[in-house]
Curated annotation (Swiss-Prot):
Belongs to the LeuD family. LeuD type 2 subfamily. Its EC number is 4.2.1.33. GO terms for molecular function: 3-isopropylmalate dehydratase activity. The keyword Lipoprotein does not apply. The keyword Amino-acid biosynthesis applies. This is 3-isopropylmalate dehydratase small subunit. One of its GO terms (biological process) is L-leucine biosynthetic process. The lineage of its organism: Bacteria, Thermotogati, Deinococcota, Deinococci, Deinococcales. It holds the Pfam family Aconitase_C.
Length: 181
């Protein structure tokens, strides 16, 4: 089961998620050691693949940088759950196939190190220590599809062959009928 890392403060900004001094690469594995460094210097050493960050409101505010998502994903974080997110961070999460889940009362329901059961289909997270279950805002199917594909670009690349197959029986584009005549 994934462990929970609680960052209870509201307005944790992208500079705290990945400090600007480390924005010299876009390789997740190279960003990972610096994830949350200015907030918790040892976070990247403790986090395990699939672990969950529980955070306060407006997580990801500040500068628009995809590196904030890449650093957390590179460190092994499986999802961030907060009451709400800065819109640009939320969109960057979707575009990069990373789970950002909105859930009221999440910070009060968990302590650092708790284990959790995250049920995406059911829209719930359960604290295994206390048995408390909370419901989060359902993830739109589109966002789940993008996440499953690994990000927006990968999702779109997968759509191109499907669209090409659909268009093979379509009428030729006007003016293209005699292109090879």
């Amino acid at each position: 089961m994934p462990r929970v890392h609680v960052f209870a403060r509201d307005h944790i900004n992208t500079d705290e998620i990945i400090p600007a001094r480390h924005l010299t690469t876009d390789i997740e594995a190279e960003l990972a050691p610096y994830a949350m460094e200015d907030y918790d210097r040892d976070f990247a050493k403790r986090v395990q693949p699939g672990d969950i960050i529980v955070a306060g409101a407006d997580f990801g505010c500040g500068s628009s940088r995809e590196h904030a998502v890449w650093a957390l994903r590179g460190a092994g974080v499986g999802a961030v759950i907060a009451p709400n997110f800065a819109r640009i961070y939320y969109r960057n999460s979707i575009n990069n196939g990373f789970l950002a889940l909105e859930c009221d009362g999440i910070v009060e329901a968990f302590q650092d190190g708790d284990e959790a059961n995250l049920d995406l289909k059911g829209g719930t997270i359960t604290n295994l220590r206390t048995g408390q279950t909370l419901t989060f805002v359902p993830v739109p199917q589109f966002a789940l599809d993008v996440q499953k594909a690994g990000g927006w670009l990968e999702y779109m690349r997968a759509q191109v062959p499907a669209e090409a197959d659909d268009s093979s029986s379509a009428q030729p584009h006007p003016g293209k009928e005699n292109a090879h005549a």
